């Protein structure tokens, strides 16, 4: 959802109902597709389990994977020496992959499984990278005014977006997803190290 309270915890009962084609088109497409699928299986003898990951980090297979979610970590390798005051909820791609496989026979029919590991501020991610890898990674937080100025010229940022996200955070209740689906449960340091090393390997 694009509307949330600071500190809100989302559950598998929540839907992206406020999204539209012009506002959060990605969330709208995902939400509408799931609603259509759930309606379709409701009148058929078809088993349905859905997987809902937070932002997905981890080793990549191709340069095109540097866009999307991994652009957050690409910033630490190739971006400017500062970070936005943004909180990122993420999970390891390897946990997400196993979740999809194990859901086939271990997932409860009709259930929505949130797959999420941790939420960190970008400056915290920089600190973990600095303590784990060679090189220097950004930890200096860009002041809000300068962040808004940056958004005016950045193709992937908008002032409206930053007004919602700067200095705010949410989280997710994963319930028993990791246990039920028997996920490896990668620790955050491993995820971040493997992700950044994978980004560097694309050069």
Predicted regions, residues:
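Conserved C-terminal active-site "lid" loop/helix of NAD(P)H-dependent oxidoreductases
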Residues: 127, 151-182
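Mid/C-terminal beta-alpha module of Rossmann-like enzyme folds, strongest
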Residues: 99-157, 190-203
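Glycine/proline-rich active-site loop of Rossmann-fold NAD(P)-dependent oxidoreductases
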Residues: 43-46, 58-70, 103-113
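Conserved SDR Rossmann-fold cofactor-binding beta-strand/turn motif
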Residues: 52-53, 57
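Active-site Tyr-X1-5-Lys
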Residues: 20-49
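Glycine-rich Rossmann NAD(P)(H)-binding loop
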Residues: 58, 83-86, 113-120, 130-131, ...
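Conserved Rossmann-fold NAD(P)-dependent oxidoreductase catalytic core, especially the SDR/UDP-sugar
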Residues: 1-24
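A conserved pocket-lining segment of Rossmann-fold NAD(P)-dependent short-chain dehydrogenase/reductase
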Residues: 17-22, 63, 69-91, 95
């Amino acid at each position: 959802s694009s509307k949330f309270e600071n500190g809100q915890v989302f559950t598998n009962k929540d839907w992206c109902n406020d999204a539209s084609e012009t506002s959060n088109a990605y969330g709208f497409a995902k939400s509408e597709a799931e609603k259509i699928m759930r309606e379709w299986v409701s009148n058929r003898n078809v088993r349905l389990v859905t997987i809902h990951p937070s932002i997905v980090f981890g080793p990549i297979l191709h340069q095109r994977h540097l866009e999307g979610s991994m652009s957050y970590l690409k910033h630490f390798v190739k971006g400017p020496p500062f970070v936005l005051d943004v909180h990122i909820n993420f999970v390891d791609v390897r946990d997400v992959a196993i979740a999809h496989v194990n859901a086939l026979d271990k997932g409860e029919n009709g259930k929505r499984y949130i797959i999420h590991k941790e939420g960190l501020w970008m400056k915290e991610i920089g600190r973990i990278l600095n303590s784990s890898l060679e090189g220097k990674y950004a930890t200096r937080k860009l002041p809000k005014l300068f962040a808004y100025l940056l958004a005016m010229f950045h193709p992937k940022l908008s002032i409206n977006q930053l007004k919602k996200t700067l200095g705010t955070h949410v989280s997710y209740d994963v319930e028993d997803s990791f246990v039920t689906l028997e996920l490896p449960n990668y620790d955050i340091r491993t995820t971040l190290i493997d992700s950044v090393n994978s980004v560097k390997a694309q050069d």
